[in-house]
Amino acid sequence: MGIIKFDKVTQVFGDLYVLRNITVQLTERRIAVIGANGSGKSTFVRLINGLQLPSHGFVSVDGLDTKNDAKAIKHKVGFVFQNPDNQIVLPLVEEDLSFGLKNLKLSKEEVKERVDEILQRYDLQNFRNHAVHLLSGGQKQLVAISGVVAMKPDYIIFDEPTTLLDLRNKRLITQVIEELSQTAIVVSHDLEFIRNFDRVLVFDKGEIVVDDIPLVAIKEYIRRMS
């Protein structure tokens, strides 16, 4: 089993303390991170894959330090942004799915095999040559997730993956995340979405104020917000 460790992590931007002395270990398969806007949750997950580096303390993924092993960690930790338009870089679905794989220095045959596999897995075969900008919000998000899954990281971070979606597409993305073999760490405001997770971290003013199973954590979060 893999492990993500935060050891006395503080994150400061100017005079603003975004995270304060966070020490935690993550080992569960489905972990939700919730809290009010500005509570530090997005900064927390961005520290995991090295999108940000801690001002103080250490973050490690399976023993690799984010400050010293950035390249290895980027291969181990995938990241899905809230808005798929910030992630999809090429105009056609197949081109975009192939883009990240080519950065792994795979052969043409290996790239094609992985793209074919992921298109079939998520029932996207008919969209192979479609223009991404013509897809629905849910389809775009599925393409963005597919691109990350195809790279076979050990962990995938999702930053508000259902915020921009209607109910039907929320259910689709929820199912996709539930069926992942990788560890999923999900930032979300959607409490219904995270009810079946293994663990929930509640952030407030840069600190983890609740760390428990969903039933307990969500109840306490609602109490604090009321």
Swiss-Prot record:
Membrane topology category: Peripheral membrane protein
InterPro entries linked: AAA+_ATPase, ABC_transporter-like_ATP-bd, ABC_transporter-like_CS, ABC_transpr_CbiO/EcfA_su, ECF_ABC_transporter_ATP-bd, P-loop_NTPase
Domain of life: Bacteria
Disulfide bridge map: none
Localisation per UniProt entry: Cell inner membrane
Gene3D superfamilies: P-loop containing nucleotide triphosphate hydrolases (3.40.50.300)
Domain ABC transporter, residue spans: 4-222
UniProt keyword Membrane, yes or no: yes
Residues that bind ATP: 35-42
Pfam families given in the database record: ABC_tran (PF00005)
A GO molecular-function descriptor: ATP binding
Gene Ontology annotations for the cellular component aspect, listed alphabetically: ATP-binding cassette (ABC) transporter complex
PROSITE patterns reported in the protein's UniProt record: ABC_TRANSPORTER_1, ABC_TRANSPORTER_2
Membrane spanning residue stretches: none
EC number(s) on file: 7.-.-.-
Keyword terms: ATP-binding, Cell inner membrane, Cell membrane, Membrane, Nucleotide-binding, Translocase, Transport
Main function: Probably part of an ABC transporter complex. Responsible for energy coupling to the transport system.
Family the entry assigns: Belongs to the ABC transporter superfamily.
UniProt protein name: Putative ABC transporter ATP-binding protein BH02760
The species this protein was found in: Bartonella henselae (strain ATCC 49882 / DSM 28221 / CCUG 30454 / Houston 1) (Rochalimaea henselae)
Highest classification ranks of the organism: Bacteria, Pseudomonadati, Pseudomonadota, Alphaproteobacteria, Hyphomicrobiales
